[in-house]
C-alpha cells in the first residue's frame, strides 16, 4: 500500500499475514481480534450499570469480562438499551461479530460505543486494542447520552478495524476516529447526526473526523450532516505531538458524501496532515444550497500535504476534472488571506 499514489497495491505488503476477515482492507486489515480465544455467546439484550450485578450473557459482560482473546457472537437480535457507554480501551483482544445475530441484527441505543478517549497510557492511550467490530447499528439518541458523545468513535489507540457499521442519531459526530494507527473503517453508513440536540455548543449535527498513521477510511456513506462531512483532523505542529497521538499518512477514498449543509463547513481540515483523498463522490442535496460549499472537495490549510485526485462532484464538471483549483484552493478560509502560489503547489503530493 503506497500513500500519495492511486491505490493499486492494497494487501500486497505483509502478504503472508492473515486478514482480519475476507474483504478486510487498509491499515487495520491484519488485526487479529479474538482469534484463537474463547467464543462468547450473547444470549440477552439486557445491560447493567456500574452499581448493578453483572449479567452473564450480555454484550457488556462479554466485553468487560477479560482482556484475553475472545470472539463475541449473538444468539439474540434486537435493541440493546445501554445503561452507560461501552468502552474498549481496558478490554482489548476481541472480535464482535454482529452478523451472527438472527433476524434484524443488533442496535445499540442510549449511549456511545467508544474505543478509547483516554490520554492516560495506564488505561489505553497509545495502546493496541486489537479489536474487530462488524455489523452493528449504533444510534444513541439524546435521551440519556452526554452532550458530546459520538455514536461510535475513538482516538489515541492502534490496531482495529470496523466494518459494516451503521451510525447515526448522535449528539456529536456519528463516526469519528483520529490519532489512530493501523486502523480501518470500511463499508459503513454514518448519517443523520442530530443538529438541534443537547450539545453544549448548540447546533452540532456533525458527521465524522478522520486522521491517523496507516489508517484507512473507505467505502463510507456520510449523509445529512450540518458539518464535518468529513473533517480531516487538524494536527499539532510537527514535533509537538504527544506519544499517544499517532500521526503519519492516512487514506480517505471511495466514499460518498451527500446532503451536507451549505451553512456548515462540509468537507474541511487537514492542517499539518498528510493523506490521500481520492475517488470520493460528492452529491449536493436539498440542504446544501448553491454556494461554494456545493462543490467543495476540501477546505484545508497550506500546511496540508495531500494526494487529491479522482473525486467526482455531481453537477460540476469543472471541479470533477480539476479537484484542486476550485475544489481545494478556491475553498481556503478568508482568514488565510491570499495564499502564495508556491504554498498551494507545495500542498500537492505527487
Spans of model-derived segments:
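Acidic Gly/Asp/Thr-rich repetitive segments characteristic of extracellular carbohydrate-active
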Residues: 19-72
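A mature extracytoplasmic/lumenal domain signature
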Residues: 44-46, 76-78, 100, 112, ...
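Acidic glycine-/aspartate-rich tracts in secreted/extracellular proteins
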Residues: 46-48, 70, 77-79, 100-103, ...
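Structural detector of coil-to-beta-strand junctions
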Residues: 112-114, 122, 151, 174, ...
Amino acid at each position: 500500500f503506497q500513500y500519495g499514489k492511486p491505490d493499486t497495491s492494497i494487501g500486497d505488503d505483509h502478504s503472508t499475514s492473515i486478514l482480519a476477515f475476507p474483504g478486510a482492507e487498509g491499515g487495520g486489515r491484519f488485526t487479529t481480534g479474538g482469534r484463537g480465544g474463547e467464543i462468547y455467546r450473547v444470549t440477552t439484550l439486557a445491560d447493567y450499570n456500574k452499581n448493578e450485578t453483572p449479567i452473564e450473557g450480555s454484550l457488556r459482560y462479554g466485553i468487560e469480562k477479560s482482556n484475553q482473546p475472545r470472539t463475541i457472537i449473538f444468539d439474540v437480535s434486537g435493541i440493546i438499551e445501554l445503561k452507560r457507554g461501552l468502552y474498549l480501551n481496558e478490554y482489548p483482544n476481541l472480535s464482535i461479530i454482529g452478523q451472527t445475530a438472527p433476524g434484524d441484527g443488533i442496535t445499540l441505543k442510549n449511549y456511545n460505543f467508544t474505543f478509547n478517549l483516554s490520554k492516560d497510557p495506564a488505561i489505553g492511550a497509545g495502546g493496541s486494542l486489537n479489536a474487530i467490530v462488524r455489523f452493528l447499528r449504533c444510534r444513541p439518541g439524546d435521551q440519556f447520552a452526554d452532550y458530546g458523545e459520538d455514536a461510535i468513535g475513538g482516538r489515541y489507540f492502534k490496531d482495529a478495524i470496523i466494518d459494516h457499521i451503521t451510525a447515526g442519531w448522535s449528539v456529536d459526530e456519528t463516526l469519528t476516529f483520529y490519532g489512530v494507527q493501523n486502523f480501518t473503517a470500511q463499508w459503513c453508513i454514518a448519517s443523520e447526526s442530530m443538529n438541534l440536540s443537547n450539545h453544549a455548543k448548540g447546533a452540532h449535527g456533525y458527521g465524522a473526523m478522520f486522521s491517523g498513521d496507516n489508517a484507512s477510511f473507505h467505502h463510507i456513506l456520510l449523509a445529512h450532516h450540518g458539518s464535518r462531512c468529513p473533517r480531516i483532523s487538524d494536527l499539532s505542529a510537527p514535533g509537538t505531538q504527544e506519544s499517544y497521538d499517532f500521526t503519519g499518512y492516512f487514506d480517505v477514498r471511495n466514499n460518498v458524501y451527500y446532503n451536507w449543509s451549505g451553512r456548515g463547513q462540509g468537507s474541511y481540515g487537514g492542517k499539518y496532515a498528510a493523506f490521500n483523498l481520492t475517488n470520493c463522490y460528492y452529491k449536493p442535496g436539498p440542504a446544501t444550497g448553491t454556494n461554494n460549499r456545493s462543490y467543495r472537495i476540501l477546505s484545508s490549510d497550506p500546511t496540508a500535504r495531500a494526494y487529491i485526485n479522482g473525486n467526482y462532484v455531481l453537477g460540476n464538471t469543472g471541479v470533477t476534472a480539476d479537484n484542486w483549483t476550485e475544489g481545494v484552493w478556491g475553498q481556503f478560509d478568508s482568514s488565510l488571506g491570499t495564499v502564495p502560489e508556491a504554498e498551494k503547489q507545495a500542498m500537492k503530493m505527487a
